[in-house]
Regions:
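Walker A/P-loop
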Residues: 17
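Conserved phosphate-donor/acceptor-positioning beta-strand/loop module used by diverse small-molecule
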Residues: 89-90, 100-125
Length: 186
């Protein structure tokens, strides 16, 4: 079987991480996140992993090393991965897929859910320190950030869309159907 590379683009707290974790646990695939390299840098310099700091370090890297710097790193990691199933999570801008889309077996998947549902999930999970006290209005403002504005545009270019307004079982069923469409045997 040839390699299947699923690239997840999705709104904030839409379920990208949940799906990546599910696939990792069920199929033992590797997952690559654009934010991992950013968190690594922030951790190394002992700076809080807030959403604002993640966006700032991303901007600094892109401005100084090229808009495609993170895409280059991720695509090389994915290309060198020997697994039959690979997940790339956190695609946010067109340059993120510049090199990924040239890899055989790459499929862009858009994951979405209603804003209120996503805000409730974000507050509950508290992935970043600044999320636990965030109001719904602040959440909606965050979605106006540069990278978040491009997500819907990229979502329009995706091969498949997953709507995550239902149950966790429905979410898993949708990804299993997509894998079957791409010839993955479970």
């Amino acid at each position: 079987m040839s390699k299947i590379i699923l690239g997840f683009v999705g709104d904030l707290a839409s379920g990208k991480g949940t799906l990546a974790k599910y696939l990792q646990e069920k199929y033992h695939c590797n997952t690559y996140r654009f934010s991992t390299m950013l968190r690594d840098i922030l951790n190394r310099i002992y700076v809080e992993n807030s959403r604002e700091n993640l966006q700032l370090i991303s901007k600094i890297l892109r401005e100084n090393f090229g808009q495609d710097v993170m895409s280059t790193v991720i695509s090389k990691d994915v290309e060198n991965d020997k697994n039959e199933l690979v997940v790339v999570e956190g695609i946010r801008r067109p340059t993120d897929i510049t090199y990924l889309q040239n890899l055989l077996g790459f499929h862009l998947i858009y994951i979405t859910a209603e804003p209120k549902t996503r805000w409730e999930r974000m507050v509950k999970r508290q992935e970043n320190p600044d999320e636990k006290d965030k109001t719904f209005e602040q959440f909606l403002l965050d979605e106006q950030a540069e990278a978040d504005m491009l997500i819907k545009e990229l979502g329009g270019k995706a091969e498949k869309t997953i709507n995550n307004d239902g149950t966790i079982e429905e979410l898993y069923s949708q990804i299993e159907n997509i894998l079957a469409d791409y010839g993955h045997k479970n």
